């Protein structure tokens, strides 16, 4: 009996060529995560400071603009309105910090919107636990 390995080989090739970001099912890639320490350094140095947008319940980080929780459509519209004045290659950092990163209801809708609008240089602040533990308790700059 002759076995046909072509379908299996085809599946292996397709799976090897998948975008690594698609495996996480997140709208951002690893390269689009910005560590809090690096953003703090940029704010402190005053050089190369990106546009910083809070998409959560409060404005904590120095120099940031508050939009409100982006789980709500009216705040997604506020974000859309704000960034309509930005260039597609502007450096932009979004952050929330309301809860552990994996459970946050605000970051995915906001980041998805930025992708759909064609922004090329937007990042998500890598707040793994919450804004208190990952920013305030670290002594980083606050409003």
Task: Identify the function of each model-found stretch.
Residues 1-2, 14:
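Intrinsic disorder/low-complexity signature
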Residues 2-9:
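Sec-dependent signal peptide recognition
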Residues 10-11, 114:
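Generic alpha-helical structural signal
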Residues 11-61:
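Flexible, polar/low-complexity N-terminal or interdomain linker segments that lie immediately upstream
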Residues 16-30, 59-93, 97-143:
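Rhodanese-like catalytic fold shared by cysteine-dependent sulfurtransferases
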